[in-house]
Amino acid sequence: MNFDIPEFLPALPEIAVLGMGCVLLLAVAYGGGQSGKIAYWITQLTLVIAALLTFYFLDYSSQSVTFNGSYIKDSLSDTLKLFIYIIVFAVFLYSRDYLQARALDKGEFYVLGLFGVLGMMVIASAHHFLTLYLGLELLSLSQYAMVALLRNNRWASEAAMKYFVLGALASGMLLYGMSMIYGATGDLHVAAVAEGIGGSGSSQVLVFGVVFIVVGLAFKFGAVPFHMWLPDVYHGAPTAVTLYIGTAPKIAAFALLMRLLVEALGDVQAHWQDMLIILSVLSMAIGNVVAIAQTNLKRMLAYSTIAHVGFLLLGILTGTGVGYAAAMFYVIVYALMSLGSFGMIIFLSRSNFEADRLEDFKGLNERSPWFAFMMLILMFSLAGVPPTVGFYAKWAVIMAIIDKELLWLAVVAVLFSVIGAFYYLRVIKFMYFDSPTEEISLSKRADFRWCMSANGLAMLGLGIFPGALMGLCVAVLG
């Protein structure tokens, strides 16, 4: 391979994040008592630098493939990376006070989070199966360690162990599927695999490889019946870690799905479409029904995530540009909604108190009317109530599957959306119709309050004016 300077330019954001990650490691090691504060500012600066570099080299009219075909810079990768930077920036901002109150502000959270971002970036730009796998493992290993940050907490240790064991199982299935694809096509480059399948058609080995890849992806997404790790991890992990896991990595998982199923295995859509239909219906059914019985808000949002994964898969299984664009719109919007929802749990939390029970939101309207209104917008958006952006996201996906003449699937999606609205409205009932159980004032940094307000209002603004974001998704995938 000819390592000339232009070949490294498309990967400059990844190189910058890797370099700053090494600087961050040194800063944490030698920062002493100020290591947490230093790590926070270095991490946020790194995300800003990466965003500026990505934006500077942004070009929707062309794409470049480098590193011997294992890395691609295209409109999909650049767009997803920009949203990853924005969301992770907000995650670190929301988490700062939470970590300080629990003596977790030592720098490890930011180091692991930044290397997780690097893993997401690699996934978004991967053009080779092994590059995809390496990016996925970098992200996964960072998340396993983050879940176990509270070493002396039984719930966190149990969640980390479950996450690690089941994550390793999913990675093994994904890798085994990739090896079977290699056996069937003789290559692991995304474009070469697609070309090989188009030239020779499907074989039994190829179909088995597709099955293992879909199962591995379902594990990583938390789709039913491979969802058993997700509620325990969301509940057991510190809320700051749950906030991280439940937002930006979903965008990276969407990129993984697009690179593997759509770009590499698009010609065998007939084999994976039926599997995605089953995963989607089961996820919407189990996710929405089980969420109704939850009294812990983090567990409720975990089952809500499973239901939203089902909706996301609906867009992918259409096999059309409109469906892919709707799915991309949905995953970005979901990440923003999840960001605000877990951010509100952190907003109510304080030292030695996790505001993760539904009862903790009782009477929030009396204690803080503005942030009760923000939570109302977020819950309405997750439920898909107009005029929030959650309604438009679901409508776009449903229209895409109707265009594909899968009318029965659209009816199922609408039915489970109506069922799912119940548990979101229950949170609103606690905030507005119940009396507060305590009168403790809610105080957070000004930057937290401004960011949370922007997060909530964005759900309303994007719902009223969805054209810009949807136009971007259509330009990338439609």
Curated annotation (Swiss-Prot):
This protein's name: NADH-quinone oxidoreductase subunit N 2
Record's function text: NDH-1 shuttles electrons from NADH, via FMN and iron-sulfur (Fe-S) centers, to quinones in the respiratory chain. The immediate electron acceptor for the enzyme in this species is believed to be ubiquinone. Couples the redox reaction to proton translocation (for every two electrons transferred, four hydrogen ions are translocated across the cytoplasmic membrane), and thus conserves the redox energy in a proton gradient.
Question: What family does the entry list?
Answer: Belongs to the complex I subunit 2 family.
Q: What is the lineage of its organism?
A: Bacteria, Pseudomonadati, Pseudomonadota, Gammaproteobacteria, Chromatiales
Instruction: Show the stretches that span the lipid bilayer.
Output: 8-28, 38-58, 75-95, 109-129, 130-150, 164-184, 206-226, 238-258, 275-295, 306-326, 328-348, 371-391, 405-425, 457-477
Keyword Transport assigned to the entry: answer is yes
NCBIfam families of this UniProt entry?
Answer: NDH_I_N, PRK05777.1-5
- Quote the subunit structure annotation: NDH-1 is composed of 14 different subunits. Subunits NuoA, H, J, K, L, M, N constitute the membrane sector of the complex.
NAD among the record's keywords?
Answer: yes
Which reactions does this protein catalyse?
a quinone + NADH + 5 H(+)(in) = a quinol + NAD(+) + 4 H(+)(out)
